[in-house]
Structures are given as structure tokens and as C-alpha cells.
Amino acid sequence: MKKQIAILGSTGSIGTQALQVIEEHPDLYEVYALTANNRVDLLVEQARKFMPEAVVIANEEKYLQLKEALSDLPVKVYAGADALSQIVESQPIDIVLASMVGYAGLRPTINAIKAGKAIALANKETLVVAGELINALANQYHTPVLPVDSEHSAIFQCLEINNRLEKVILTASGGPFRTYTMEQLQTVTKAQALKHPNWEMGAKITIDSASMMNKGFEVIEAKWLFGMRPEQIEVVVHPQSVIHSMVQFEDGAVKAQLGMPDMRLPIQYAFSYPERVKSSFERLDFARITDLTFEQPDTKRFRNLALAYEALYRAGNMPCIVNAANEVVVDAFLKDKISFLGMSDVIEQTMGKVAYIKEPTYEDYVDTDAEARRVALSLLSS
């Protein structure tokens, strides 16, 4: 029986690579639903190739265009946030790949968990914003949440039953500005920030990687995926991106997962878990690896990592505040409305201006997200 897969964000970097995995294993996987935010042309192309049961476009203004383009196919067409959240509940679906960008992925992921679907989680913001809620729901509905982030997939693959962890070690490439001085960071452009040295990703996550907010979010994500305390989660800069992450056990032994910097590998493992499936992806050639280096991250130059740790220690709705402010400032940076270093200033100020809630409900997260965005936008315009 083929696994039926719904891909939330099929036109993005993770979504398109997931379709490559499915295409390589047509005997194992079948696309049930594809969703996108705005990119109608690519969604149509994907629908014609993979023939899903349904497609959803989040932007309701694009519905008629999508409907017309697929009028000759027996594919159901839906639009809007409600449709996006409802499609994941469809009975045939086995796995939901949550690869939408940002806060928008929270509600459909919650609905998928409640519907008992296995979650292949690429949308780290879902756990950043509401990790405690997601974990509680996953336990309540007995729903597996499998990491797709390369670092968390690496940790997941290194874990051993009944062997207690001392800490997890997340590796970071350091991004394009790893060796830049503070003076150089003051004048970097979005064009420079969008050139990641090792990974091909979408614009938002590429900027997050350059600012190290992406690594900060992964620290928060690791807390909820693996039940770690903040002080048990270490970040080490590893420019070669060959070691994807490590775990250290109480006896001092360390296990690492190595591989090419190719997101199709963790995507495929999330789809096939607990089995491993043969792939044609490029193999690691140790004879060509000249060095593997490590260094401590500089949180003075890359303050976002320190802000993420602070949010994790404070807990409650603080990570939600950081995520919302970050989405606002990254959008502003991509529109040349704020400097690279200025992003951290706005995030930190937003953390101090939005009301703190120690034990937030889902409604509190919704309100916090809206208020943090309002505050961050007002700081940008002041």
C-alpha cells in the first residue's frame, strides 16, 4: 500500500525536493494533496505531473486562475486558510509534510495532528511558536512528529533507546557572514545575505540562516522534539556542513550523523521511518574531505542566537513574540527597509514591549502573534 502524502508548501524549496523523493519512489509514495501560497504556475505544473486528489492555494484571489488552469483534470481545487487547514484532515492521508514558511503553518499542523496524521515537520516555526501545545496534542492524539530539518533529523537518527543524553550539539554553517566584522555587517545587502555557502533554500530561511535566527529557532525546536533543557542544547559552527548534528551521552560518548548537504535525505527518512529506503542521491566521499572544522558561535555579532536562547529560557509566549517580530523584520530587510544588524534591535525591543504570558493557550498565541507584528511594524516606522 502506497503512503498517501499531503505537502503543505509544495512550491517551496522543501516541497519541490519532497516531490523529487516521491518521484524516485513511485512504488512507495503517492501525492494526495498539494498546497501553495501564491505560485499558481508551479502548482499547476506539479498537479499535472503528480495528479493529486486536491490542490489548495492559500491566496483566495488566485482561486479562479488555478481552477481554470486545471479545469481539464479531475483534481479538486480549493482556496483560503480554512481550506488549507481542512485538507490535511482527509481520511486517505498518511503523512503531512509541513513545509509552509512561518507562523502560517501552525493551524494546519494542529489540525493534522488532531486527525491522526503522521507529521513530517519542516516548518520549525510551529514548534518555536507553540511547542508545548504541539507536544501535548501529539501525545493526546498519539501522532508521531518526525523532524525534517537536517540537524534534528541527524539527532533523531543518533538517538538510542534507554541511553540517556547529556546534551545535543547542533551544527551551524555560520552562513555567508561567518568571518565578517561588526563594521562589515553594518553594510551587508540582501543580495549578499541570499547567497548561502552550502544550502539551497527559500529567501526567508536563507536570511534567517545569515542572521543565525534559523539556528536559534532550531535550538527551540530541539527542546520540544527531544525534551532537552536549554543548557543541554549546544550550537557549534561547522562551516563544511558535513556533520549535521551530534548527541553526547552521559558516559561522554558522542554520535554524529554525516552526509551531503542535501535536504532530500532527511525528507526521505521522515517519509520512510522506521525503514531506510535506497536512494540515488550523491554519496559522501571521505577521500575528498580535506578538513572538518569547528568553532564557537559569536553571539555579539549574531545577536539573534542569543535572543532565541533568552526566549527559550523565558518560555511562555516569548518564542512566539520573537518569531512574529522576526518575520516582520526579515520581510523588511528583503524590501531594503532595515539594515542587517537593525533586525536584532527590533526583535529585542519587541520582546520588551509585548505582554508576557507564562502559560499561553492557542488563542493567546494567535493574539501574541498579532500584537508582536503590530509592535514590530510600529518600531520599523518610528
Swiss-Prot record:
It is an enzyme of class 1 (oxidoreductase). InterPro entries: DXP_reductoisomerase (IPR003821), DXP_reductoisomerase_C (IPR013644), DXP_reductoisomerase_N (IPR013512), DXPR_C (IPR026877), DXPR_C_sf (IPR036169), NAD(P)-bd_dom_sf (IPR036291). One of its GO terms (biological process) is isopentenyl diphosphate biosynthetic process, methylerythritol 4-phosphate pathway involved in terpenoid biosynthetic process. GO terms for molecular function: 1-deoxy-D-xylulose-5-phosphate reductoisomerase activity; manganese ion binding; NADPH binding. 1-deoxy-D-xylulose 5-phosphate binds at residues 124, 150-151, 173, 196, 209, 214-215, 218. This is 1-deoxy-D-xylulose 5-phosphate reductoisomerase. Catalyzes the NADPH-dependent rearrangement and reduction of 1-deoxy-D-xylulose-5-phosphate (DXP) to 2-C-methyl-D-erythritol 4-phosphate (MEP). It catalyses: 2-C-methyl-D-erythritol 4-phosphate + NADP(+) = 1-deoxy-D-xylulose 5-phosphate + NADPH + H(+). Keywords: Isoprene biosynthesis, Manganese, Metal-binding, NADP, Oxidoreductase. Mn(2+) binds at residues 149, 151, 218. Pfam families: DXP_redisom_C (PF08436), DXP_reductoisom (PF02670), DXPR_C (PF13288). Its cofactor is Mg(2+); Mn(2+). NADPH binds at residues 11-14, 123, 125, 202. Pathway: Isoprenoid biosynthesis; isopentenyl diphosphate biosynthesis via DXP pathway; isopentenyl diphosphate from 1-deoxy-D-xylulose 5-phosphate: step 1/6. It comes from Phocaeicola vulgatus (strain ATCC 8482 / DSM 1447 / JCM 5826 / CCUG 4940 / NBRC 14291 / NCTC 11154) (Bacteroides vulgatus). Its EC number is 1.1.1.267. The keyword ATP-binding does not apply. HAMAP family: DXP_reductoisom. Belongs to the DXR family.
